[in-house]
Amino acid sequence: MTISDHPETEPKWWKEATIYQIYPASFKDSNNDGWGDLKGITSKLQYIKDLGVDAIWVCPFYDSPQQDMGYDISNYEKVWPTYGTNEDCFELIDKTHKLGMKFITDLVINHCSTEHEWFKESRSSKTNPKRDWFFWRPPKGYDAEGKPIPPNNWKSFFGGSAWTFDETTNEFYLRLFASRQVDLNWENEDCRRAIFESAVGFWLDHGVDGFRIDTAGLYSKRPGLPDSPIFDKTSKLQHPNWGSHNGPRIHEYHQELHRFMKNRVKDGREIMRVGEVAHGSDNALYTSAARYEVSEVFSFTHVEVGTSPFFRYNIVPFTLKQWKEAIASNFLFINGTDSWATTYIENHDQARSITRFADDSPKYRKISGKLLTLLECSLTGTLYVYQGQEIGQINFKEWPIEKYEDVDVKNNYEIIKKSFGKNSKEMKDFFKGIALLSRDHSRTPMPWTKDKPNAGFTGPDVKPWFFLNESFEQGINVEQESRDDDSVLNFWKRALQARKKYKELMIYGYDFQFIDLDSDQIFSFTKEYEDKTLFAALNFSGEEIEFSLPREGASLSFILGNYDDTDVSSRVLKPWEGRIYLVK
């Protein structure tokens, strides 16, 4: 039912779905080569279904040289052989559907690999028909040593210049990410058509139900690619967002992409589109149903709290109030509109949420993991769960730089070493930053059992592609948690059941109001749906604390909490305790 004053409550499958994100390299290895693969995912579909989720989102499985773990695609229509075959993928889609779940794939179309045939043609000569499918520019000049100077001062998201010099034609190509991850030029209509046909149409024809659209705000660059104003006075290179994010034609491009999808699908299924927009104030424009762009967006505000806007590994202090406001910004904009929101706190680009936002000590890891589950399940929007989050995975501890795999970490390590030295203060700060914030924390292989050395991810005599987080030896694994009724895993199952039972309030709830916003310990709020009110009281501290009622004399009916032995009529919360109530 749609509430007339709240068009956002119009029911849709993709609004009510809980979506489980899979990082294929690290999920499950079926053939003992050390890499996760598509057959491995297929073998665990029942586990995912039993968790209580409704759809899976699989990160890139396409052919790729793997400079950035598959986000550098060399062929959109072929599975990377290490992950399997196209037939393996078609089987995975089919079996996902047979279990009553939807299949969502990653759509990486801001850039492709330099190994893609399109780029090979483009780089071959300045007169090639595909030359304008990418951003080619001559050097701005040459330095005293005769080295070419990049066309502008944009910094790569992964550090260093956003330009790479190519000696084939003595020009630079733009690549906002890794050196061989070259940006596609959406201004070129032939390029757009080819992207739509190869990356989108091919997979729609094979039954996918939706796309997670990678870097969805970057397709329209600032005309002329001018130098960025100086925002970071400590650096000659400037963050590329000013010149590349939410550009003048971005909404036009998403409307065109949506039209292509709608026209391609002939069986009536509704394709969901979640755009990774990251920053900016355009979320309501992107997601308005009347504008036909994307279904919902991922914003980064709440997961970037506590990090520097200039360098993601610089840790800065933050308050609970700041985090609360950042989380709420993900969904407040949809209130009373035809837009929609997402709720997530983990993905393949973020460290583990218990370490980041709760307490990963042995004493409180489990209870604070359940607290984050309560928070996420009580927020309005489409819910996303990232592999390992459901078992309360935490960051790995005290790994040397040699154990890290992420190209972003490796690039910045080399830049800092060259600029400041191996034993500098800057390097020590960098090590603190990656210990808390590195993407690698989310990319360690999934621990299925307690068995050494590989926790059931791959065979015992196989060297996995990436080191396992040693936490599987302390009980953070699927096997042990499945048998433990008090585990984070089984709490997730109960929480997802509650979210479905109370979906009007938990999924579609509107008129969100903070209670005790200024508190640095309590995260509490109310939401409405018709004449019903949900109240959440969550203690984000290691101390007992009393919470305020949503209104004087309110009568509370308990729904769910993360402590079994608690007096739900008491207004005192134990350390890291959370409760969800109906207000009578």
Curated annotation (Swiss-Prot):
InterPro entries: Glyco_hydro_13_cat_dom (IPR006047), Glyco_hydro_b (IPR013780), Glycoside_hydrolase_SF (IPR017853), O16G_dom_2 (IPR045857). The active site is at D214, E276. It catalyses: Hydrolysis of terminal, non-reducing (1->4)-linked alpha-D-glucose residues with release of alpha-D-glucose. The record marks D349 as: Transition state stabilizer. GO terms for biological process: maltose catabolic process; sucrose catabolic process. The keyword Protein biosynthesis does not apply. Its EC number is 3.2.1.20. Keywords: Glycosidase, Hydrolase, Maltose metabolism. Pfam families: Alpha-amylase. GO terms for molecular function: alpha-1,4-glucosidase activity; alpha-amylase activity; glucan 1,4-alpha-maltotriohydrolase activity; oligo-1,6-glucosidase activity; sucrose alpha-glucosidase activity. It comes from the Eukaryota. Gene3D superfamilies: Glycosidases, Golgi alpha-mannosidase II, Oligo-1,6-glucosidase, Domain 2. Belongs to the glycosyl hydrolase 13 family. This is Alpha-glucosidase MAL62. It comes from Saccharomyces cerevisiae (Baker's yeast).
